[in-house]
Amino acid sequence: MKQNIHPDYHFIKVQLTDGTVFETRSTWGKEGDTMKLDIDPRVHPAWTGGRSQLVDAGGQVARFNKRFGALLKKK
């Protein structure tokens, strides 16, 4: 393996939406940083079978519906 071409691989903390924190190794951030997730497998509709509501961070869904809502209406 070539030397000095790979990113630094270090420990970070990952905080889930319910506040649970676990430690893993990653190339993201710096040693000891905390990655806060907006959505995770416990609340994402793809993994929960659509049982939970998707959080609209920043009003992106509302902005999309405002721009393209007319195209989605059934005729």
UniProtKB/Swiss-Prot annotation:
User: What processes in GO biological process is this protein linked to?
Assistant: translation
Q: What are the record's GO terms for cellular component? A: ribonucleoprotein complex; ribosome
Gene3D superfamilies linked: Ribosomal protein L31
Q: Which Pfam families match?
A: Ribosomal_L31 (PF01197)
What InterPro entries does the record point to? Ribosomal_bL28/bL31-like_sf, Ribosomal_bL31, Ribosomal_bL31_A, Ribosomal_bL31_sf
Give the superkingdom in one word: Bacteria
Keywords for the protein's UniProt record, in alphabetical order: Ribonucleoprotein, Ribosomal protein, RNA-binding, rRNA-binding
Q: Any idea which GO molecular function terms this record carries?
A: rRNA binding; structural constituent of ribosome
- Keyword check for Ribonucleoprotein, yes or no: yes
Q: State how it assembles.
A: Part of the 50S ribosomal subunit.
Protein family: Belongs to the bacterial ribosomal protein bL31 family. Type A subfamily.
**Role according to the record:** Binds the 23S rRNA.
Which NCBIfam families has this protein been placed in?
L31, PRK00528.1
What name does the UniProt record give this protein? Answer: Large ribosomal subunit protein bL31
Question: Which gene does this sequence derive from?
Answer: rpmE
